[in-house]
A protein has these predicted regions:
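NAD(P)+-binding Rossmann beta1-loop-alpha1 motif at the extreme N-terminus of oxidoreductases
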Residues: 1-58, 84
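Rossmann-fold dinucleotide-binding core
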Residues: 3, 91-171, 175
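Hydrophobic beta-strand scaffold residues
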Residues: 26, 46, 110-112, 153, ...
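Rossmann-fold NAD(P) dinucleotide-binding segment
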Residues: 49-111
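Helical "substrate-binding/catalytic lid" subdomain
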Residues: 162-225
Length: 225
């Protein structure tokens, strides 16, 4: 398979590494030249995408960036061969995902609504969770890339939108967990509980959560990058 990952940030870089590790020819694209150079040094490809590309994961920030990558002045969809698939991994509104699916279909390109979860470490391990929805053809075309980047792929429907709806549910809970964790940490500090001890104890108790275990160490260390 010939694949590309557009967006080599904390999540996209790990996805690109995982796809490359699965012995697929993999192109990395990013406005950050250092990220691209690092990927090339690890065996990846850069430069113009091949005309016979099979799959593209778009791992950017939001709907506006996704649309720009797909249909902007340098948009990739009109250049993709018929039967190729776009895996759209950003968190976007469900209606936007449905619109992108229809626009891709008009070019003979499959669109898989494929928001991701798991964090940078799991992206690098090829162990993400993907909340996916799309046609059977989109799933089939995306399978080699999904197999490389994820250990859990939820099939949530036969059209785009359902995956993004589920991601919105996940993000609501994630936001609540982060806010509650911050309030709990602050409360503990007012009671004389050291932040380091808060993290040590609560991580092993019923009040823990994935977001606490993933984000609280950064907060306690004062590292917000």
């Amino acid at each position: 398979m010939k694949a590309a990952v557009i967006g080599l940030g904390s999540m996209g870089y790990g996805i690109a590494q995982s796809v490359l590790r699965a012995d697929h020819q993999t192109w990395g694209v990013d406005i950050n030249a250092d990220a691209v150079a690092r990927f090339v040094a690890e065996g990846g490809q850069a430069g113009d995408l091949p005309s016979d590309l099979n799959a593209v994961a778009v791992v950017v920030l939001n709907a506006a960036q996704t649309e720009s990558v797909l249909f902007g002045p340098q948009g990739i969809v009109p250049k993709l061969p018929k039967g190729a698939v776009v895996l759209a991994c950003a968190t976007v509104p469900p209606d936007f995902a449905r619109d992108m699916e229809a626009r891709c279909a008009s070019h003979g390109v499959h669109y898989l609504d494929a928001p991701i979860s798991g964090g940078a470490a799991k992206a690098a391990q090829g162990a993400l969770s993907v909340m996916a929805s799309g046609t059977a053809e989109a799933f089939a075309a995306a399978k080699p890339m999904l197999d490389a980047m994820a250990t859990t792929v939820f099939s949530l429907g036969d059209g785009a939108g359902a995956g993004s709806a589920m991601k919105a549910v996940n993000q609501l809970l994630a936001g609540v967990h982060i806010a509650t964790m911050a309030e709990a940490l602050t409360f503990g500090m007012t009671q004389g509980v050291a932040p380091e001890k808060f993290l040590e104890v609560i991580s092993e108790c019923a009040g823990s959560s994935w977001m606490l275990e993933n984000r609280a160490p950064h907060i306690v260390a004062g590292v917000y990058t």
